Amino acid sequence: MKHFLLLAIIGILFLGSTYGASVATEKLKASNCTKTEGFQAIACVLRMADFAQKIEKLDMDDKNQVNEFEKSCVSFANCFETLQCGPEDPAEKKINNMIKNYCDAVVYVAKDFADCSEKLENKNSTCYQNWDPFPDAIDEETDEKKKEKMLQEACKNYFGKDNCLKKEITEKCSETEWKGFRDHFIGISNILLECDFRNIQ
């Protein structure tokens, strides 16, 4: 599960670093922003690399590491929010929300979903073990028509073939566990995919 969570944060950090550099420049140019605030924006962008390293090294079975990761999530997400100069930027807000949703999902999987995850692994659930909501092949595809079809297929199977994760999690754990899992992963789906989950119960 950590593999695709890492893919998701790479998506956020790519957006954040590309966009963040321009934010920092705009903060410096804005008439009501000080140079200090502009450099603080640049520092936020530079912290993305450190944040990515923490994710790569994170042992989701180590509660102390997860707690430290949770603290760094809050600190990182608040980085741009502390800058009070200039108008609120919708793109900046979107990236902050993506980071928050991602962090919530990682902490949820490591803490709240840990027992259910263990049950599914002990059961050797094929659906759970083969679950790959962000297939690598999508990024590697250069043909736009094929890529569009792959994205549609990824959305259709986001919770496993024929929505099999709902059945697996509900039967092995509970409906409450399924709803928590569903809600957290819908929250991070818009990082790499644009899916319509209105019919997912």
Swiss-Prot record:
Keyword line: Glycoprotein, Membrane, Signal-anchor, Transmembrane, Transmembrane helix
Subcellular location: Membrane
UniProt superkingdom: Eukaryota
Entry's transmembrane regions: 4-24
Residues modified by glycosylation: N32, N124
Residues spanning the signal sequence: none
Organism per entry: Caenorhabditis elegans
Record protein name field: UPF0376 protein F10G2.1
Extracellular side, ranges: 25-201
PANTHER family: DUF19 DOMAIN-CONTAINING PROTEIN-RELATED (PTHR21453:SF28), DUF19 DOMAIN-CONTAINING PROTEIN-RELATED-RELATED (PTHR21453)
Family assignment from sequence similarity: Belongs to the UPF0376 family.
Membrane topology: Single-pass type II membrane protein
UniProt GO cellular component terms: membrane
Chain ranges on the Cytoplasmic side, renumbered to this chain: 1-3
UniProt-listed Pfam families: DUF19
InterPro entries listed in its UniProt record: T20D4.11-like_dom, UPF0376
